[in-house]
Amino acid sequence: MASTSTASATAMAGAFAAAGVNKPRGSAACPRVPAGGRQRLSCVVRCDAGPGVPAQMAAMAASVAALEQFKISADRYMKEKSSIAVIGLSIHTAPVEMREKLAVAEELWPRAVAELTNLNHIEKAAVLSPCNRMEIYVVALSWNRGIREIVDWMSMKSGIPAVELREHLFMFRDSDATRHLFEVSSGLDSLVLGEGQILAQVKQVVRSGQNSGGLGKNIDRMFKDAITAGKRVRSETNISCGAVSVSSAAVELALMKLPKSECLSARMLLIGAGKMGRLVAKHLAAKGCKKVVIVNRSVERVDAIREEMQGIEIVYRSLTEMYEAAADADVVFTSTSSESPLFTKEHAEALPPVSGALGGVRLFVDISVPRNVSACVSDVGHARVYNVDDLKEVVEANKEDRLRKAMEAQTIISEELKRFEAWRDSMETVPTIKKLRSYADRVRASELDKCLQKIGEDALTKKMRRSIEQLSTGIVNRLLHGPLQHLRCDGTDNRTLDETLENMHALNRMFGLDTEKAVMEQKIKTKVEKQKTQN
C-alpha cells in the first residue's frame, strides 16, 4: 500500500474520465491512486535481426532487449502501485437485459480468470457472477490501463458497446473495493438485504480460484476475510432472521399475483432443481402448497428434494416433458443455467389457457440470469412474466427492520476491513525485509569465509566452527532487529503507514536494495514470459 500523493485527486479524476465509469463512493480520491498521464508502454518486445544474423544471435539480442525493456517498464510503473480494484454491475445499476449478457456460469469462472490475467496490466483476478451481479476483482499493475482493458474485455464478451456499458458500471479501488466485497458477502448489497446465498457464492469463488491459481495472495486473503465478515454479520446482528431470499421472494410474488382464494390450489411447476430451485420448493411447502411438479435433467436432485421435504408431494418430469408439464401448470418457476430461453412467445401461445378462477393468466416467475423466459411472452394474452428485477416490490415490505441491523453490520465490516488493511500494509515491507536480510547474510557469509581462511580450516574443530557461525548470525540478527522493527506495519504500534514507508525507502537508499523496482521488474518479466509461452 502506497502513501497518498499530492496528485491523487487529479489522477482519480483522470482514471474515471479514461474508463468512463462511476466514481467510488465515500471520497473524491482513494489512497493509492497513481499519477496519470504516462505514455502507454507495451510489454511485448520485438527484436528483428538482419538476414545474415544467425537465429541464436537474434534470440540473444531479443533477450538483452527484453531485459532492458523490463528496467524501462519498471521505472515507468514505479509510482503506479499494484491496486486491488473491482469493476462490475448489479441489480442496482443495470437491468437484467444487460446483466444476462455479462453473466458467467460458475463452471466458466476459471476460463474468465485466465482471460483476464492474460490482459497486459492485470496481474490476478476473480469473477463473482450470481444472478443479481457480475463483478470482476483484480490486482492491476496499472490503474488506468487495467480498467480500460477490463471494460474492453466486458464489451467484447457481451457484445455491448463500451460507451453503453460504462453508463451502468461501478468501480471501487483498494479499501473501497474491499469494503464493497465485505458488504456483498454480508448481504448488505443484495436485492434482499441479509440474504444468505451470496455468502456461499463468495466461498465458491475461493474454491474455484484455488483450483485455477488465478487469485493470488491479495485477492485470496480479501475473499477469505469477506467470508469471515459475512459470518460475523449474520451471527452478531441477526440480519438474516426473517430475511427473505430471492427464491422466497419469487414465491411471495407469485402468491401476490394469484387470487387469495386460489393460492393453495394453483398448480405449481418448477423447472430446475439446483440450489435456487430447491429453495423455491422449500418456500412453496412452507406456504402450504401440497404438490409441486419439478422438471430437471436428472432425477437424483429431485429425489433429494423429495427426501428433504416430506410434507409435500414432489412429482418428477424429464426435460422432454417440460412443455407438457407447463400446459398443466398455473404457475411456472424457472431456475436453470440455460444460456437460451426455454419459453418464447411461440411456446406460450401453444399452451392452453388456465382456469378462469385464476384470472385466465399463466404466471411465469423467472429467477434465472440469463433469463429462461423471453420478455415477449407477456405479449401473449393469457401469460405474464416476472423476472428478478420484479422482486423489488416484495423486498421493500421487509426492508425497514433489516436496515437498522445493517447499520450495526457496518461496525463489524469496519473492524474486518481494518484487520485486512493492516495485513496488506504489512505485506508492503516484506520485499525490503527479505532483501535486507539477504544482503546482510551475504556480507556475513563473505566475512566469515575470509575469517575462516585466515584461521585455517585445520585449526578449528566442528564445535568451534559452529560457534563462530552462530556468533556471526547473532551479531547480524541483533544489528537488524532495530531497523526491522521500524518496518512493522501490523497495527501493534502507534507508527503511521507513511512513517513505516519512509523507513522502508530510507533502508532501500542506504543499502542500495532498490526493492520496489526489482519487484516491478519481476512482475513485468512474469507477464512477458507468460505471453511468450502462450504465443
Swiss-Prot record:
Catalytic activity of the protein: (S)-4-amino-5-oxopentanoate + tRNA(Glu) + NADP(+) = L-glutamyl-tRNA(Glu) + NADPH + H(+)
Subcellular location: Plastid, Chloroplast
Protein's UniProt keywords contain NADP: yes
Biological process (GO), any one: protoporphyrinogen IX biosynthetic process
Biological role: Catalyzes the NADPH-dependent reduction of glutamyl-tRNA(Glu) to glutamate 1-semialdehyde (GSA).
Species for this entry: Hordeum vulgare
Tissue: Primarily expressed in roots.
Binding of substrate, residues: C131, N132, R133, S190, E195, G196, Q197, Q201
Extra remark: During catalysis, the active site Cys acts as a nucleophile attacking the alpha-carbonyl group of tRNA-bound glutamate with the formation of a thioester intermediate between enzyme and glutamate, and the concomitant release of tRNA(Glu). The thioester intermediate is finally reduced by direct hydride transfer from NADPH, to form the product GSA.
Coiled-coil region(s): none
Record family assignment: Belongs to the glutamyl-tRNA reductase family.
GO cellular component: chloroplast
Active site: C131 (nucleophile)
Protein name in UniProt: Glutamyl-tRNA reductase 3, chloroplastic
